[in-house]
Amino acid sequence: PHPYSSAASDVYKRQMKARVDTAVAQRYGRTDLILTYDNDQFFLNRPLLLDAGLDLDEVARFVAGVAETAPEVQRVLTAEELRPGAFFEGAEANVLRGWSAKMSGDVVVMLKPGFLEYGRTGTSHGSPYAYDTHVPFLIMGPGVPEGLTGMARTEIRDIAPTLSALIGFPRPSGCTGRPIEDLFYE
């Protein structure tokens, strides 16, 4: 199959899980330390790690090191790296914005640009790269300066606060973006 087809994606996902499962079994003598690999994330079996006296972050670093050897992988981030929130720009910052300490995996795999891990039912919410996160933004109407072009890059997360500011509504709860300033100054 074509390297970016859904069939290839299914193969990649199985191969990635098998690669890491094998290495974890060899290192730790157990095959049950990883619950699942889904949506480019490894979810570790936290209760089992605790019972076995294994350090979650150390096992996550080991899993990341193994996953990083796959040819499709650009970078691998552990929860330990993501928890401090140290990424402010680029693809890593996009990963961080979508990551939750309570809900996300313990190891996040960033695939190389152009590659998505998804099955036959469709694609994902996108990669963390600019070609997948850039949305052309066109706006017109009362309160919008006429003929304004060439604004700075617009982030998806800036659209809701911009529209809220234009119509005089409070920003939505949990909103992380900012109104697009060019629209409010002539």
Residue ranges and their predicted role:
Residues E68-E72, S164-P172, Y185:
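Sec-exported extracytoplasmic/periplasmic mature domains
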Residues I156-D158, A165-P179:
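Extracellular ligand-binding/catalytic regions of CAZymes and related secreted enzymes
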Residues H2, G150-R153, R171:
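Short N-terminal micro-motifs specific to bacterial/archaeal maturation
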Residues P1-A8, Y12:
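Single conserved hydrophobic/aromatic residue that forms the stacking wall/gate
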Residues P1, R27-R30, G168:
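Glycine-centered secondary-structure boundary/capping sites
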Residues D10-T162:
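Active-site neighborhoods of enzymes that stabilize oxyanions during catalysis
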Residues P179-E186:
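C-terminal helix-and-tail extensions that cap enzymatic domains
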